[in-house]
A protein has these predicted regions:
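Phosphate/ribose-phosphate-bearing ligand recognition and processing surfaces
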Residues: 1-52
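A generic structural signal for tightly packed, nonpolar segments enriched in small/aliphatic residues
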Residues: 7, 38-309
Length: 309
């Protein structure tokens, strides 16, 4: 927990500026804010703060690391330039290391399972989770909070092409679990899965991921509440309480074995999308729980709130 009990004015200026910068970056077109640009912004943050370091993997590094989800989603052509961005802030909090993971698909066409053309221009906002994580880290470092953080942004485009990921393809995620890809437009969970495992292996004790993950959360909660799914009551309770204080409201959705059963494959460990339309947000969260590495974890589906101004 971080205290805000002193110097409200300076805290407010920093937090407000970081929020506005995140929202600004979310509205930028892909040709202005692509994966390389996100990596560049991460580098700017690291250069500005001595307690922040950054490491960036390109396509070759992602493949060598065994991040099969991020690698597969990035197969939509040689112009796609994926990045795995890892920042570490060492504030010497002396407590548990917080992991933040932000989905950073800089443009999402849906891939071979292509989206309808109407409204597709808004899919530049599919990197909202990554934008939020980047600017949150910048604010935390600017305020010199006594907390240690690992932030991971899996960044790519989801594009159709002759080389793109196809329905029916089988991939192996970083933790060794196999996934049959039944819908290439359910790509966010594939890249988040690798990023969450990476975050845990880098030393995170607790993980919070932010992602514009499902349209289903918009149907269920609109743009007032973000969806929250968690395997840990204490962590979920902290997030709910902070949301009430700040106006960033969240609504907790359940995890249950019957939902988890829907994610199981017949020829693989998992399938990335269900043939059924029901409980889409919970399905995605249940899929992600397979990649927590046993850590307390919370998933925030911000598909409804990220684009709300």
């Amino acid at each position: 927990r971080v205290s805000y009990e002193h110097d409200y004015e300076s805290h407010g200026v920093v937090l407000g500026a970081s929020r506005d910068y995140a929202k600004h970056n979310t509205t930028l077109s892909f040709n202005v804010m692509g994966s390389r640009d996100l990596a560049g912004r991460a580098g700017e943050i690291a250069d500005a703060h001595e307690k922040v370091t950054v490491e960036v993997l390109d396509r070759e590094g992602i493949s060598a690391a065994g991040m099969g989800g991020l690698e597969a989603v990035s197969k939509g052509g040689q112009h796609v330039e994926p990045r795995l961005i890892t920042l570490k802030y060492t504030g010497r909090g002396g407590g548990k290391v917080l992991g933040l993971v932000g989905k950073s698909v800089t443009f999402d066409t849906g891939g071979i399972s292509i989206k309808p053309s109407g409204g597709m221009e808004e899919m530049k906002m599919d990197m909202s989770g990554g934008a939020a994580v980047l600017e949150a880290l910048d604010a935390i470092a600017s305020l010199d909070f006594a907390i240690d953080i690992i932030a991971v942004l899996p960044s790519t485009e989801n594009m159709p092409s002759g080389t793109a990921l196809k329905p029916g393809d089988i991939i192996t995620q970083l933790n060794g679990k196999t996934v049959e890809v039944t819908n290439t437009d359910a790509e966010g969970r594939l890249i988040l899965a690798d990023a969450m495992v990476h975050c845990a292996r880098e030393g995170a004790d607790r993980i919070v991921d932010l992602a514009t993950l499902t349209g289903a959360v918009l149907i269920g909660l609109g743009s007032t509440y973000a969806g929250l799914i968690s395997n840990d009551d204490d962590l979920a309770g902290e997030i709910i309480a902070v949301g009430k204080r700040t106006g960033e409201l969240v609504w907790r959705l359940p995890l249950h074995d019957e939902y988890k059963d829907l994610t199981k494959g017949t020829i693989t460990d998992l399938v990335n999308a269900s043939s059924q339309r029901k409980a889409g947000t919970i399905y995605a969260g249940s899929f992600l729980e397979e990649f927590t590495e046993g850590k307390p974890w919370a998933h925030l589906d911000i598909a409804g709130t990220a684009w709300d101004t």
